[in-house]
Swiss-Prot record:
InterPro entries: Metalthion_11
The organism of origin for this protein: Yarrowia lipolytica (strain CLIB 122 / E 150) (Yeast)
Gene Ontology molecular-function annotations: copper ion binding
Assigned protein family: Belongs to the metallothionein superfamily. Type 11 family.
Entry keyword set: Copper, Metal-binding, Metal-thiolate cluster
Designated name of the protein: Metallothionein-2
Amino acid sequence: MEFTSALFGASLVQSKHKTTKKHNLVDSCCCSKPTEKPTNSCTCSKCACDSCKC
């Protein structure tokens, strides 16, 4: 019984981690083609390039 609850707890922690990771990806931005203009929904401060894509 303890083993099952431990497994369940681990899966809960894992799913929480995934959501956080996804959220971080939304907050940060990735470099895109230089021809593209940065979108308003995206913060480019974390990027080293002129344009970014969320």
